[in-house]
Amino acid sequence: MDELKKLAGVYAAGFVEDGMVVGLGTGSTAYFFVEEIGRRIKEEGLSVVGVTTSTQTTKQAEGLGIPLKSVDDIDSIDVTVDGADEVDPQLNGIKGGGGALLMEKIVATPTKKYIWVVDESKMVDQLGAFKLPVEVVQYGADRLYLDFESKGYKPSFRVTEQGDRFVTDMKNFIIDLDLGKINNPVALGDELKAMTGVVEHGLFNGMVNKVIVAGKDGVKIVEVKD
């Protein structure tokens, strides 16, 4: 599996050129993309500026010598490469398995070319088998949990290995919704966004331009159909 992830991540780095501002994703597949950018800076003299999507990626990028800027200090991002937990045929996706969905969406928004790197197991006919993360403010989180429960969304607070509630980089909680199937990702996204106390959700609808899929037969690119 790691070999497939590496294949996708390294392939995606081919879209990065000198002088670009590059969004650096979070997660096990994006990790290989960031590593490859670091290698190209060191070995090929690639000149880029990175914008990170989590403290985890910031540490990785700093260790590789990738120059970084805050998303607040740039006008736009040329290309962002990130992973995804599930991707449907319309290229809507679920992200946030690593807990970085808010920062990932903030970086994706000013991005000109937004690319996901996945292994073929992430491509699904319908979203929802992977639990949908919802980032919520800590104050009132238990009330939101009950709201989700009453809607039949099978919520659970994400917890650490120690059993404490997981806290995101932005100091929020995550409630994972076990929905089974999501029939209308756009409508659900709108519904969740309208709930007071919800900061962001892990549905990335209509945001990605292309998905690089690594499988046993190599790499294929899936693009949004016009």
Swiss-Prot record:
Source species, domain of life: Bacteria
Protein's pathway: Carbohydrate degradation; pentose phosphate pathway; D-ribose 5-phosphate from D-ribulose 5-phosphate (non-oxidative stage): step 1/1
Pfam families named in the record: Rib_5-P_isom_A
GO BP terms in the entry: pentose-phosphate shunt, non-oxidative branch
GO MF entry, a single one: ribose-5-phosphate isomerase activity
Annotated EC: 5.3.1.6
Keyword Transport set for record: no
Coiled coil: none
Binding site for substrate: T26, G27, S28, T29, D82, G83, A84, D85, K95, G96, G97, G98, K122
Transmembrane stretches, start-end: none
SUPFAM superfamilies (UniProt xref): D-ribose-5-phosphate isomerase (RpiA), lid domain, NagB/RpiA/CoA transferase-like
Catalysis performed (reactions): aldehydo-D-ribose 5-phosphate = D-ribulose 5-phosphate
Quaternary structure and interacting proteins, as annotated: Homodimer.
Record protein name field: Ribose-5-phosphate isomerase A
Highest classification ranks of the organism: Bacteria, Bacillati, Bacillota, Bacilli, Lactobacillales
Gene symbol of the encoding locus: rpiA
